[in-house]
Amino acid sequence: MAMNTETLSLIKQSIKTIPNYPKEGILFRDVTSLLENAAAYKATIDLLVEQYRNKGFTKIVGTEARGFLFGAPLALELGIGFVPVRKPGKLPRATISQSYELEYGHDSLEIHTDAITANDKVLVVDDLLATGGTIEATVKLIRQLGGEVQDAAFVISLPDLGGEARLTALGLELVKLCEFEGE
């Protein structure tokens, strides 16, 4: 489905670039500036609704924390459940965990064991795709619980960091509203 170029431009222009944050040489893409712009935020959710309406999804999974900001409103608009994937120790019921590699070490994510069933067709939503490590871990959690996941949506993609290739290798179809070069 072709997306409106004018709307995509509004979204991309609302994302501020912060040089040398969090460290020297990084161009940080600040999605919080998009959230501050009601028209751009609404346009983002509306585009995702248009993209995924009537596709048969039963759940949206969002990864902590900014995935919640786009996944939850999308789930409401689609009339389906939202499932948060969180850092360890943040979910109150029984969970499963998946580790993933960071630049310097590793971390892990958790999901409630009863949040996804074998009947669920799941869309993963996050704000930014960089290396793909957190989304790969999220997909593994969903699949471990028996959910079907073949789609992931992102507001921002940084294709130079390899995440797109990593996730397509997992069999995911990706929707990215904005792409930025560099790190």
Swiss-Prot record:
Gene3D superfamilies: 3.40.50.2020. GO terms for biological process: adenine salvage; AMP salvage; purine ribonucleoside salvage. GO terms for molecular function: adenine binding; adenine phosphoribosyltransferase activity; AMP binding. Pfam families: Pribosyltran (PF00156). InterPro entries: Ade_phspho_trans, PRibTrfase_dom, PRTase-like, UPRTase/APRTase. Keywords: Cytoplasm, Glycosyltransferase, Purine salvage, Transferase. It is an enzyme of class 2 (transferase). Catalyzes a salvage reaction resulting in the formation of AMP, that is energically less costly than de novo synthesis. It comes from the Bacteria. It catalyses: AMP + diphosphate = 5-phospho-alpha-D-ribose 1-diphosphate + adenine. Its EC number is 2.4.2.7. One of its GO terms (cellular component) is cytoplasm. The gene is apt. Belongs to the purine/pyrimidine phosphoribosyltransferase family. Homodimer. It comes from Shewanella sp. (strain ANA-3). Pathway: Purine metabolism; AMP biosynthesis via salvage pathway; AMP from adenine: step 1/1. The lineage of its organism: Bacteria, Pseudomonadati, Pseudomonadota, Gammaproteobacteria, Alteromonadales. This is Adenine phosphoribosyltransferase. It is found in: Cytoplasm. NCBIfam families: apt, PRK02304.1-1, PRK02304.1-3, PRK02304.1-5. The keyword NADP does not apply.
